[in-house]
């Protein structure tokens, strides 16, 4: 589960390396976010020449979490790290590549562009 002040790895080539969660979007007083949820974050580490700079306030969608995600068939999936992809307001990614696997739950939340760019969907 991702909450305010959580730090996440960025799984795309937008130029950011690490982000810090400012707010979980979707409802008043919502505390936690899981795979497929949108967050507002700030860039904490960035590489030179990237599309985003350190200190930028961005929106991102969570693609991997360490905590378990329960599926409809009763199975669970988790990952080794918490990771997100920086997106625009229309849910399209800022970067042109996605690194690492992403969860299948993104397909249910209409992030088809992220799913199509990902090398593996679990």
UniProtKB/Swiss-Prot annotation:
GO molecular function, one term: structural constituent of ribosome
Key words of the record: Ribonucleoprotein, Ribosomal protein, RNA-binding, rRNA-binding
SMART domains membership: Ribosomal_L14
One Gene Ontology cellular component annotation held by this UniProt entry: cytosolic large ribosomal subunit
InterPro entries named among the record's database cross-references: Ribosomal_uL14 (IPR000218), Ribosomal_uL14_bac-type (IPR005745), Ribosomal_uL14_CS (IPR019972), Ribosomal_uL14_sf (IPR036853)
Keyword Nucleotide-binding in record: no
Family note: Belongs to the universal ribosomal protein uL14 family.
Chain's role: Binds to 23S rRNA. Forms part of two intersubunit bridges in the 70S ribosome.
Subunit structure: Part of the 50S ribosomal subunit. Forms a cluster with proteins L3 and L19. In the 70S ribosome, L14 and L19 interact and together make contacts with the 16S rRNA in bridges B5 and B8.
This protein's name: Large ribosomal subunit protein uL14
Gene: rplN
